[in-house]
Design a protein with these regions (language model features):
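Non-catalytic cap/lid and distal C-terminal segments of serine-dependent acyl enzymes
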Residues: 2-168
């Protein structure tokens, strides 16, 4: 009843945590986009109760025109993850949903002299930040990428460019 009324969440449910990362890779973009990049981080239910446990991470990249909240406003990531974990379809994991939005609506997660180094932001800074702040399994075989539209392109391109060293 508490979860349904917006009160305390059930122990069987994960939670969404807003976070922000200041990106050196995006500081010098020519259009004045902020290098402070918002994200949402889904933490599984056991994250709060199992302090010694580490988790694999999936980086979920949104499409053109979207932002970090797209996955929770247009797609039910949190309830979907809670259900998939509860049913045993997937194991518990951390899901990171960073904003790849820029002044043009989307970065395509590639490095650019004009819009900033988005590949470096995701593959170097974001991964290092998440591994440092959250209890991740900090190795390529425990990291995955997924995305929709522009994010699907980004997931494919980043996965290919950084296969074995960052993602596997």
């Amino acid at each position: 009843a508490a979860a349904a009324s917006g009160g305390a969440q059930s122990a069987a449910m994960g939670r969404l945590v807003p976070d922000t990362l200041h990106s050196k890779a995006l500081e010098k973009n020519l259009y004045g986009d902020t290098p402070d990049r918002p994200m949402l981080v889904y933490l599984p239910a056991s994250y709060a109760t199992s302090p010694g446990r580490r988790y694999p991470v999936v980086y979920l990249l949104h499409g053109f025109g979207g932002a970090e909240r797209t996955w929770v406003t247009l797609g039910p990531v949190k309830p979907a993850m809670d259900t998939l974990v509860r049913n045993g379809t997937v194991r518990e994991m951390i899901v990171v949903m960073p904003s790849g939005r820029n002044v043009f609506g989307g970065s395509f997660y590639t490095n650019s002299a004009s819009t900033g180094n988005w590949d470096d932001f995701v593959s170097k800074e974001l991964v290092a930040y998440i591994d440092g702040k959250y209890r991740t399994m900090a190795r390529p075989e425990s990291r995955g990428l997924a995305g929709h539209s522009m994010g699907g392109y980004g997931a494919f391109a980043l996965g290919m460019r950084h296969a074995g060293d960052v993602f596997e």
